[in-house]
């Protein structure tokens, strides 16, 4: 401050702003000094004078002097001339001149030079702009504007960005004011004048300004801050102006209101114009925030709006940093803005607290992305604008912040209301429009009175204020009332949604960006948001998609907003309430809460803040509040932040957090909504009715809680009522129930500790609300009331205990979500269902709400019965639907329950909370019950939905997916959103496969119910967005993590969480205080774990809060944004960020992973406890739970949880995909999100994605599409799977909880594992689930029982204990052994080691995890899909397979494999023992994930040496296990029969394992002698010299891989492999590693694989099912290993990598495991059973596997190897599978690939086997890899392979073209979006790659031989696919990077970087290939070479 000249008056600036300005000034001084130094140095050099002049810049000064000879000050000259001239030209625009002058002078006085410069530029342009409209506006503006400027914010604002802000604000205001009496600043006029008359000029000018702004910002700050400053000043000024304006008592509230109406109608675009002078009203949505700010400011809720707008602007229009800055500024500004600060001082705090997450995201180029080009149309059509915004959103979202930011931008209108919820969240997203809302949200408390007074109902009020401003402004529809109705209520709804929607929306934003409608639709939030928008402009889109209903609801609800209490519009209200729920919390809730709950909010600022944060957090305030205040509520709020974070990477923290917060906020803001909606009306109502509704609410909430039974009845009653008069009951019940629920549950929650679960529930509900949004009918109605209740309760809870809030919220949410619960169930079950529910919710809502509500009631009753149960049910419903994402974001945030949102969310929350074990167990029971009920209900509902919503389903699915994803990712969507897109796609795809889609919904619902946890886990897919967001968030900080957790998606996102990793981290830190805090802490821990040793500690905390963490882990979904959603919405956590930036684009993986971890861990614990039925114990042993579970048999639960974690992790990876896309992939994911969001129609999504693709999300797009598709289907599976996974993971989590490694491993590997598993499972499970869904339903209950009873848990713990102990003994040699033992014993050492490992690994893991995360992102991109799918698959596959395939027996083994690692294990387990198997597989998986993660951590930690130490142990373990498995498989090929014995064996198998280890060695020796020998040798070597061997091999592998593949590819991949394989490929890699340990090439990756294999082995030993899985895997491994070995060391290296990756896929990701085992199982089945059905499943699994592999595992070669083995049977079965897959899974691309894959698999396998090592090296890599890639492509795993062959096939961008297009949405979607970027990526490859890389690539291309070689060899095998493969293989490199953002993210850290990463990979590949690869290597064989030559 001292440096600022006295002339600068910063009085109007808040500290943050002043600080930023000072920073800029200081930087300016520094730069000047540096320049002087430089020049002085230059002058010292005796050189040519001309040269000197040129270098020193004297020439310029000279020119300037000549030009401005009379000007002494060059800077002044530079500034004045433009401004001066422009202003002079605009004599009329004297005001502008004045502001400009003032800007110059005042700016000089008050404003920093940079700003003044910028301002002056802006001003000049504004003048230019303004002067166009000067005639019209100048007259008014000069006086008014001057007056307004001077009077209100005159000097201060001008100081800030007087000209710009004035311009910006004036523009909208000007239109507004000119029309109305209000007078904005002249500067605004410039924009306004520019916007109405000169659109082109406006655009040009806007763009110009943006460019100048960006340049200025960059120069000034080189930070987002600069961007922030660019916009922040404007916003600040504007806000300040308005703040002063209002402060001065010059409240233009009335004017504002009027203006709002008018402005919304007329000046809607004006706002944007203000933001973007070029486009009136809509032209510049990017500037929308400013517009909103101005607009809002001028509205009654000006302070809030101002602040919110300010924040939003920052988030949206400005850089994220800007946003952050703004938000911070806003916070200080809030202080400054008297009205706001007076009304909502907490808001300021919230904002301040919230700002950091937002702060993290600062896309500098957001302005460009948000550039006018997207706005122009938008301005005309609000709806279109929103959509348009969404379309540009990908671009906008492209940057970290952009991701969020553009998203907001894209969803600006949608988010307007939303924004109010998530001021920064949605502000971030929809800074322009949303800002108005956001501020409302923020200012609801303070401005609530206004608005309240303004509108009879707060909702109406803030809807009008907020909605009008945000929404209607957004809509910009002439009929303000209609808009107001739609918007104000919508706003309310939006707001409610905002927190949730923010998260969801963020997710959706990603999705929405890709598929505006779809995304929005997919996002409940989005949907609701859409509805909000839809009401205005998005209605048609939404409506078109079944969102019309939601929209209609929204509309009516808008009206209802006013009439929250009115039940007449209850249907609408319900949706609106759903929205209000979401939005309520954020907007309505928040606002209403603010008004009604203002006291409550204030009373329980934590709750309110959480709500606010959740709501507003979306807006920084609530989040900040939550962050600060509620964090114990942090979990919730953090989720909120996470959700928003999920939603917005930069704002991701916020947006994703909102995503998470969406979850959390959903939770929170569901509560808030309840409070909000009922705040004024309902609060009293709620409070009045609380008791009455308490029962009802208790139905939902208390059902969850002690009122379980009462609530059962009430729930039924409620649901019946709701079903009967859903609208009214929803409204009433929702409100009353919610409130009572909140209150009752609050108490009860407090008592029951279900609060946490409820919190999750609330989050879920919140999320669910958005889901309900999707469902929007009753649900919404329901939710709002409930939300209000929830809000109140959450307030209480937050006040009391965030836990309770969560629990209460959950119940409440569930309750009010329960009526919508069923839709929610459906929705929850299937976020697709949610989408369906939106439609169906309307249709079926009434219809289904009767049945579904009843069922939901039932389910909810079950759920309610058990808080966890209810949570599970509700969460299943809610979480699945809204809760899942909600929970995912919210719960994930809190509970990390995105993956296992229901159970985990609830359970996790519960476990996290007080009664996790009980609740969880109940949840399990209920899950079983719910499973049955919900299954049935879900089924029927699904059927209904299928019937009714099938058409809608596409739309609904979109919404559902989005809901799903958004919730997961919600937060972030984004990645999660992306995920949601994928899900949506799948859903849409599953429109055809309605059973799949709807089934998925059903299964999700059912599974949600039956394995709510799993459902939650599925919804942990939320982390999809969350993941992305998480990753993003992680990058952002814990924001994404929060988002991830929250969204789990939005996925927290994980993305959100990750993004909020820091924020969330803090939140988590805060969280620890409360259960939710613990959850949050867990999340944070997860984040931290990912982020750092801190995370390790936190991980421990998380482990303690493991539930949360676990949930978080699973949640990791965001992050892919589903936010993003999944793309890279949030950069998610640091770890995730490392990963998710790599993931998000690394965030998902990284952050998601952490988040997934956290989520997963939390859910694991929660779920484990619940599932284990040791909930109580679990509670006791939350920390001990890991050990205890292990010992108690919680291992199964833990394992399941872990699996959930794994599932969730993949989701995070999916999220990561989102996150990756969000981060790096962020852009991609955006595209992907958009792409995926389109639904199953890849084209639509592709289009959107393409938009994003160029942004870099294409890769994610493809992958995401795949992912989403798989996710959609897999979500169903995931629903089932989550339970198992949850249980499985809990163990792993448990173990890993203690061992941070677990989290890391679990998070990273597990996540990836899950991701892969999910992918694989998704594919497989989709079919399997579809096929076995019914079966599953039945089995699901048993599975749930298995999980719940932990047959597996007990037997698993027993077996696992034994296995672990024995294997621990085996592993005792290695850290793994210790780890195992420790895990067994609750080994601290491993924890410590892991901690150390984690710490060390943290770096490695951060990098690798980044890579991993990137892979994860890929996976996560597919992950969210995958994870949910995996979860579902794991649950579904595990359970379905277990039940279905159990029935099949051996055949089941394949399904088991299909489950992925866990699913495979599950399957194996299933084969062996139904219950045990199911649980154990999950457990095994979780363990594997955990172990893998642990291994990964350890590996990373021990830097390879420990990993290798672990790896050897793991290898040994896995070898033994795999040998056992393999041997039995190989020997008997009776995986199931053998597995059964083996399962029995597993207990004994530890010993047997060693024997079998030997046998396996033998077996392996037999199948793959080279590898077998290596296996033996390697096993011994690994065990003995794993470290040495590992390092040596790793180095060798690296070198060889480098040589074989681009070093980059290898290196990142190796890291990925190390991280990923450890987690996912441990088993496979174990074999590979063992097989290839000596074959170093494999080992580096193999070692990770080894680690993973070991992890799996450990899991195996942990769980017999794991062993079985391992058994299956061993066969798989055998083939993999065999080919790998056959391939040769070099090849092995490549293969090793591939193998690892494949194994990562197989073992790491269920997919890979699945595929391996699938193949094995398929073989077994084929041989044993010979039944096409099992093989079909195998095929499915394989397809899934392939897909996952493609997505997740670059080591497809191994897969093909294994596939090769099963190839013959598999070929035929694969076709069947494809057919089945195609039908159910919609793997048409996969089907297509499948056939190819069969061919290629066989081919590749044969090739691999037949090729000599050298040939194999290159050729294998090429051919096998290609084949693998082909198979992967075929199966949807092209990416993995492509990753490997990035460079090699880079020259053949066209090669993947075919697949790329086909696979784009699908594969890329599946993989990570970055792959999607393949097509676009190709060009991007050329363009984005460094010259070095480009040259290398070109070199490769130039090498016609190389090209020919690449083409010829593979082409000979599979010409078409080879191309794709080749092309994809390069992509797999990327994909790997994508998939394992670790590889990409570490290098790039962001999705955009992902391409860079790919480039790096490519260059390495190219270099390696070019440099190290001999010509021979290029050829399949010498003949090829010769023939080619």
UniProtKB/Swiss-Prot annotation:
Positions of the region Disordered?
93-117, 348-391, 631-651, 806-827, 882-933, 1094-1113, 1124-1152, 1365-1493, 1521-1590, 1644-1737, 1921-1989
Q: Which GO terms describe its cellular component?
A: endosome
Entry annotated with the keyword Phosphoprotein: yes
Any idea where the RabBD domain is? 7-63
Q: Where in the sequence does UniProt note compositional bias of the Polar residues kind? A: 100-111, 359-376, 641-651, 891-909, 1098-1110, 1434-1447, 1685-1709
Acidic residues bias: where?
1959-1989
- Tell me the superkingdom of the source: Eukaryota
Keyword set, alphabetical order: Epidermolysis bullosa, Phosphoprotein
Q: Assembly and interactions?
A: Interacts with RAB27A.
* This protein's name: Exophilin-5
Which gene is the coding source of this polypeptide chain?
EXPH5
């Amino acid at each position: 401050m001292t440096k600022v000249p006295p002339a600068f008056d910063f009085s109007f600036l808040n500290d943050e702003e002043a600080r930023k300005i000072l920073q800029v000034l200081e930087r300016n001084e520094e730069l000047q000094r540096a320049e002087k130094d430089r020049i002085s140095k230059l002058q010292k050099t005796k050189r040519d004078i001309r040269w000197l002049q040129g270098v020193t810049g004297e020439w310029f000064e000279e020119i300037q002097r000549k030009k401005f000879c009379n000007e002494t000050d060059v800077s002044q000259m530079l500034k004045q001339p433009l401004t001066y001239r422009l202003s002079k030209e605009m004599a009329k625009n004297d005001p502008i001149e004045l502001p400009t002058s003032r800007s110059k002078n005042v700016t000089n006085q008050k404003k920093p030079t940079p700003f003044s410069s910028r301002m002056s530029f802006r001003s000049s342009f504004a003048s230019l702009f303004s002067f166009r409209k000067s005639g019209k506006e100048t007259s008014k503006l000069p006086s008014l504007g001057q007056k307004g400027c001077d009077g209100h914010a005159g000097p201060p604002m001008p100081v800030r960005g007087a000209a710009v802000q004035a311009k910006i604000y004036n523009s909208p205001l000007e239109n507004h004011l000119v029309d109305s009496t209000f007078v904005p600043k002249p500067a605004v006029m410039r924009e306004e004048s520019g916007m109405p008359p000169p659109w082109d000029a406006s655009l040009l000018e806007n763009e110009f300004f943006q460019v100048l702004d960006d340049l200025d910002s960059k120069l000034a700050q080189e930070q987002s801050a600069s961007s922030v400053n660019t916009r922040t000043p404007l916003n600040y000024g504007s806000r300040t102006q308005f703040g002063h304006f209002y402060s001065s008592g010059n409240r233009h509230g009335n004017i504002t209101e009027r203006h709002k109406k008018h402005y919304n109608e007329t000046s809607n675009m004006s706002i944007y114009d203000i933001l973007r002078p070029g486009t009136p009203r809509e032209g510049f949505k990017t500037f929308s925030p400013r517009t909103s700010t101005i607009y809002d400011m001028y509205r009654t809720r000006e302070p809030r709006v101002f602040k919110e707008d300010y924040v939003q602007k920052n988030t949206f229009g400005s850089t994220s940093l800007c946003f952050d800055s703004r938000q911070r500024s806003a916070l200080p500004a809030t202080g400054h803005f008297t009205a706001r600060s007076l009304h909502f001082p907490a808001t300021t705090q919230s904002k301040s607290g919230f700002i950091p997450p937002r702060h993290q995201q600062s896309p500098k180029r957001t302005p460009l992305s948000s550039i006018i080009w997207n706005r122009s149309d938008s301005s005309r059509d609000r709806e279109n604008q929103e959509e348009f915004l969404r379309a540009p959103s990908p671009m906008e979202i492209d940057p970290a912040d952009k991701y969020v930011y553009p998203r907001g931008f894209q969803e600006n209108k949608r988010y307007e209301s939303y924004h109010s919820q998530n001021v920064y969240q949605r502000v971030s997203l929809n800074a322009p429009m949303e800002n108005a809302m956001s501020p409302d949200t923020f200012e609801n408390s303070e401005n609530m009175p206004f608005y309240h007074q303004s509108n009879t109902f707060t909702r109406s009020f803030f809807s009008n204020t907020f909605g009008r401003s945000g929404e209607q402004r957004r809509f910009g529809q002439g009929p303000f009332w209609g808009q107001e109705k739609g918007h104000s209520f919508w706003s309310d709804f939006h707001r409610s949604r905002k927190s949730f929607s923010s998260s969801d929306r963020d997710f959706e934003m990603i999705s929405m960006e890709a598929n505006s409608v779809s995304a929005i639709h997919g996002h409940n939030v989005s949907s609701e948001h859409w509805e909000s928008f839809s009401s205005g402009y998005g209605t048609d889109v939404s409506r078109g998609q079944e969102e019309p209903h939601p929209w209609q609801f929204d509309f009516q609800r808008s009206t209802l907003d006013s009439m929250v209490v009115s039940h007449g519009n209850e249907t609408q209200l319900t949706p609106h309430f759903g929205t209000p729920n979401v939005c309520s919390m954020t907007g309505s809730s928040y606002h209403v809460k603010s008004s009604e709950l203002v006291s409550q909010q204030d009373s329980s600022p934590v709750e309110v803040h959480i709500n606010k944060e959740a709501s507003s957090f979306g807006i920084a305030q609530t989040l900040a509040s939550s962050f600060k205040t509620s964090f114990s509520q942090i979990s919730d709020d953090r989720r909120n932040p996470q959700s928003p974070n999920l939603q917005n990477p930069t704002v991701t923290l916020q947006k994703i957090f909102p995503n998470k917060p969406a979850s959390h906020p959903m939770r929170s803001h569901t509560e808030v909504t309840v409070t909000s909606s009922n705040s004024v009306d309902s609060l009293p109502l709620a409070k009045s009715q609380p008791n009455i509704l308490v029962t009802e609410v208790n139905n939902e909430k208390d059902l969850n809680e002690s009122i379980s039974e009462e609530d059962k009845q009430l729930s039924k009653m409620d649901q019946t009522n709701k079903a009967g008069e859903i609208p009214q009951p929803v409204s009433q019940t929702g409100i009353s129930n919610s409130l009572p629920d909140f209150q009752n549950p609050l108490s009860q929650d407090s008592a029951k500790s279900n609060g946490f679960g409820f919190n999750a529930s609330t989050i879920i509900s919140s999320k669910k609300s958005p889901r309900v949004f999707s469902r929007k009918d009753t649900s919404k109605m329901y939710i709002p009331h409930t939300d209000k209740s929830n809000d109140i309760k959450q307030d209480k809870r937050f006040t009391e205990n965030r836990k309770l809030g969560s629990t209460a919220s959950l119940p409440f949410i569930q309750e009010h979500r329960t009526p919508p619960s069923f839709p929610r169930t459906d929705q929850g079950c299937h976020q697709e269902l949610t989408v369906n529910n939106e439609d169906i919710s309307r249709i079926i809502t009434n219809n289904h709400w009767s049945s579904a509500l009843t069922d939901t009631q039932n389910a909810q009753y079950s759920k309610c019965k058990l808080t966890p149960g209810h949570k599970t049910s509700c969460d299943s419903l809610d979480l699945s639907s809204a809760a899942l994402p909600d929970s995912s974001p919210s719960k994930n945030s809190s509970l990390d329950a995105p993956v296992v949102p229901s159970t985990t969310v609830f359970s996790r929350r519960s476990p996290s909370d007080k009664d996790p074990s009980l609740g969880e167990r109940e949840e399990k029971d209920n899950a079983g019950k719910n499973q049955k009920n919900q299954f049935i209900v879900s089924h029927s509902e699904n059927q209904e939905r299928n019937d009714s919503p099938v058409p809608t389903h596409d739309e609904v699915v979109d919404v559902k997916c989005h809901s799903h994803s958004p919730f997961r990712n919600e937060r972030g969507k984004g990645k999660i959103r992306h995920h949601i897109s994928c899900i949506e796609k799948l859903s849409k795809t599953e429109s055809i496969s309605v059973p799949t889609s709807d089934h998925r919904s059903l299964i999700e619902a059912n599974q949600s119910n039956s394995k709510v946890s799993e459902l939650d886990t599925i919804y942990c897919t939320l982390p999809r967005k969350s993941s992305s967001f998480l990753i993003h968030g992680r990058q952002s900080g814990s924001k994404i993590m929060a988002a991830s957790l929250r969204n789990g998606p939005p996925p927290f996102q994980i993305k959100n969480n990750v993004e909020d990793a820091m924020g969330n981290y803090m939140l988590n830190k805060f969280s620890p205080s409360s259960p939710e805090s613990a959850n949050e802490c867990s999340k944070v821990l997860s984040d931290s774990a990912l982020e750092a040793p801190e995370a390790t500690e936190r991980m421990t905390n998380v482990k303690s809060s493991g539930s949360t963490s676990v949930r978080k882990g699973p949640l990791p979904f965001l992050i892919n944004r589903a936010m993003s959603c999944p793309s890279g919405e949030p950069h998610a956590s640091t770890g995730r960020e490392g990963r998710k930036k790599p993931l998000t684009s690394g965030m998902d993986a990284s952050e998601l992973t952490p988040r997934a971890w956290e989520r997963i861990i939390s859910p694991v614990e929660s779920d484990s406890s619940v599932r284990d039925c040791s909930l109580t114990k679990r509670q006791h042993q939350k920390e001990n739970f890991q050990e205890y579970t292990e010992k108690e048999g919680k291992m199964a639960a833990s394992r399941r949880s872990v699996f959930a974690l794994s599932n969730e992790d993949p989701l995070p990876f999916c999220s990561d995909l989102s996150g990756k896309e969000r981060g790096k992939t962020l852009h991609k994911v955006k595209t992907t999100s958009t792409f995926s969001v389109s639904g199953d129609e890849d084209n639509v999504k592709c289009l959107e994605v393409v938009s994003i693709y160029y942004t870099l999300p294409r890769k994610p797009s493809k992958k995401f599409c795949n992912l989403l598709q798989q996710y959609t289907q897999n979500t169903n599976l995931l629903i089932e799977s989550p339970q198992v996974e949850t249980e499985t993971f809990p163990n792993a989590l448990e173990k890993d909880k203690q061992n941070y490694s677990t989290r890391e491993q679990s998070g990273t590997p597990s996540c990836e594992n899950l991701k892969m598993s999910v992918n694989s499972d998704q594919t497989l499970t989709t079919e399997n689930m579809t096929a076995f869904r019914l079966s599953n339903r039945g089995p699901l209950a048993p599975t749930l029982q298995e999980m719940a009873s932990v047959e597996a848990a007990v037997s698993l713990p027993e077996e696992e204990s034994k296995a672990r102990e024995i294997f621990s003994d085996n592993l005792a040699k290695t850290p793994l052994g210790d780890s195992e033992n420790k895990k067994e014993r609750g080994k601290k050492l491993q924890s410590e080691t892991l901690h150390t490992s984690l710490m060390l690994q943290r770096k490695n893991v951060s990098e690798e995890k980044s890579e991993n995360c990137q892979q994860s992102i890929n996976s996560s991109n597919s992950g969210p899909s995958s994870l949910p799918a995996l979860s579902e698959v794991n649950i579904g596959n595990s359970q379905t397979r277990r039940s279905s395939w159990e029935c099949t027996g051996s055949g089941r083994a394949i399904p088991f494999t299909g489950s992925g690692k866990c699913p495979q294990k599950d399957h194996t387990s299933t084969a062996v023992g139904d219950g045990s198997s199911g649980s154990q597989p999950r457990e095994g998986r979780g363990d594997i994930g955990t172990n893998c993660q642990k291994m990964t951590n350890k590996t990373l930690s021990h830097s390879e040496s420990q990993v290798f130490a672990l790896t050897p142990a793991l290898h040994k373990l896995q070898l033994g296990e795999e040998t056992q498995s393999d041997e039995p498989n190989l020997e008997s090929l009776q995986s199931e029969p053998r597995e059964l014995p083996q399962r029995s064996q597993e207990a004994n198998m530890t010993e047997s394992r060693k024997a079998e280890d030997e046998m396996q060695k033998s077996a392996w020796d037999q199948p793959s002698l080279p590898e077998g020998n290596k296996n033996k040798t390697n096993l011994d070597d690994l065990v003995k010299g794993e470290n040495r061997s590992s390092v040596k091999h790793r180095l060798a592998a690296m070198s060889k891989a480098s040589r074989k593949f681009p070093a980059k590819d290898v290196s990142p991949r190796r890291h990925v492999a190390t991280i990923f394989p450890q987690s996912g490929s441990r088993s496979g890699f174990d074999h590979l590693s063992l097989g290839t340990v000596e074959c170093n090439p494999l080992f580096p990756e193999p070692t990770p694989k080894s680690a993973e294999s070991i992890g799996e082995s450990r899991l195996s030993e942990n769980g017999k099912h794991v062993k079985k899985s391992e058994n299956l895997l061993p066969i798989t491994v055998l083939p993999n290993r065999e080919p790998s070995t056959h391939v040769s060391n070099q090849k092995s290296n490549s293969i090793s990598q591939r193998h690892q990756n494949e194994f990562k896929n197989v073992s790491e990701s269920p997919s890979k495991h699945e595929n391996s085992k699938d193949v094995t199982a398929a073989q077994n089945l084929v041989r044993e059973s010979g039944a096409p059905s099992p093989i079909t499943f195998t095929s499915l699994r394989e397809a899934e596997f392939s897909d996952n592999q493609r997505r997740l595992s670059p080591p497809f070669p191994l897969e093909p190897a294994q596939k090769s083995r099963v190839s013959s049977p598999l070929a035929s079965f694969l076709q069947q599978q494809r057919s089945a897959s195609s039908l159910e899974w919609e793997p048409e691309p996969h089907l297509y690939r499948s056939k190819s894959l069969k061919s290629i698999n066989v081919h590749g396998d044969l090739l691999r086997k037949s090729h000599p090592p050298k040939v194999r090296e290159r050729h294998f890599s090429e051919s096998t890899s290609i084949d693998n890639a082909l198979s992967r492509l075929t199966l949807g795993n092209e990416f993995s392979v492509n990753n490997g062959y990035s460079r090699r096939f880079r020259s053949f961008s066209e090669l993947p073209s075919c697949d790329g297009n086909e696979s784009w949405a699908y594969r890329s979607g599946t993989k990570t979006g970055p792959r999607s970027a393949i097509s676009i990526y190709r060009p991007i490859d050329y363009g984005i790659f460094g010259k070095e890389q480009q040259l290398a690539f070109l070199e490769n291309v130039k090498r016609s031989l190389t090209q020919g070689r690449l083409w010829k060899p593979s082409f000979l095998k599979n010409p078409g696919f080879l191309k794709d493969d080749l092309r994809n293989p390069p992509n797999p490199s990327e994909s790997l990077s994508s998939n394992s953002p670790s590889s990409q993210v570490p290098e790039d850290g962001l999705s955009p970087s992902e391409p860079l990463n790919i480039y790096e990979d490519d260059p390495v590949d190219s270099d390696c290939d070019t440099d190290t690869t001999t010509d021979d290597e290029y050829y399949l064989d010498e003949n090829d070479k010769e023939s080619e030559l």
